[in-house]
Amino acid sequence: MKVDGNVTLSGPQQAVYDTLSDPEALRQCLPGCEKFDEVSPGRYETVLKAGVAGIKGTFTGTVTLSDAKSPESYTLTVEGSFSGGFVKGVGNISLAPEGDGSKTKVSYLGDGQVGGPLASVGQRLMAPASKMVVNQFFRCMDGQMKSRQSAGAQAGS
């Protein structure tokens, strides 16, 4: 299953990169995330509650950020299991300044596999569900960026 697209986030490239790789921001913005604990630099243990087409469960696994080239890109690897199934995926995140540099274009390209009960749902339902989760994540991250900018502006006054 492939997921790709791009989104524009509020903030300069370095600030967006820092937020997208901040464990607390990731924990807050991953839908259903109950745990996102760093176990080694760039590697996190996760617990998420999720569901697609009536199949609900708890996902436990790891998320690894690698190949970091701040502030341009990094690779995100996800591996985990849930209710007799598994999820594996790799995604590339690329960032580029947009316009006057006050916004950043984030491009993502990922490929994932699911097995077990969730695989029976099929691509027809998985693709839109994945896109919805990605959109929720980036809306939340844009909110994080705006909050951080507001806090920074208040601290500077």
Spans of model-derived segments:
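Intrinsic-disorder/low-complexity, polar/charged segments enriched in Ser/Thr/Lys/Arg/Asp/Glu/Gln
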Residues: K2-N6, R43-E45, T58-T60, S73, ...
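Hydrophobic ligand-binding cavity/cleft-lining segments
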Residues: M1-V47, G51, G156-S157
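Glycine-rich portal/gate segments that line the openings of hydrophobic small-molecule binding cavities
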Residues: D37-F82, Q136
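A conserved amphipathic terminal alpha-helix motif
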Residues: G115-G156
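N-terminal, polar/charged subdomain of small-to-medium soluble alpha/beta proteins
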Residues: S21-E24, V63, M145
